[in-house]
Amino acid sequence: MYKRQISYSKQKGFYAKPTLFDGLKENMTIAQEEIFGPVLGILTVKNDEEALKVASNSKYGLHASVFTQDINRAFHLAKSLPCGTISVNTFSEGDIKTPFGGYKQSGSLSRDQGTEALNSFLQTKTIWISHN
C-alpha cells in the first residue's frame, strides 16, 4: 500500500523526517525521480530479471544496493545494474580515492574523486619522432 507520510521538522527550513514509501509501482513519479533526502521507496519485484528491468527503465543511475548471501548473484547484479556505484550487503561509505558519479541522467557522466577525476583535467598526447 502506498502511503505518503512526510512529516516536516519544526526547525526553520525544509526538512523531512526519514520516510518509507511502500508498495510503489514502476510508473509512479516517486519511483522515477532521484530524491535527495531521508526517503526510501520500496518497489517489490518477483526476481532478479524484473529488478534489472526496473533499474534499466529508469532515466537515472547514481547508486544501487544489492543484499544477498550468494556472491555469484551479487557479482551478476552488480555488473548488470546501470549505476555508477553498487553497494553489496552494505551502504555506500565513499572514499576520496574512489570515483563517484552516475550513469544516464545522474550527474555529468564524469567522476568526482579518484584518478578518474584527475584524468579529466589532463590531455594525453602521443608524439612519434624519427631522429636520424
Provide a role label for each language-model segment:
Residues 8, 15-132:
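Conserved C-terminal structural/oligomerization subdomain of aldehyde/semialdehyde dehydrogenase
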Residues 1-5:
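Conserved small/polar residues in nucleotide/adenosyl-binding loops
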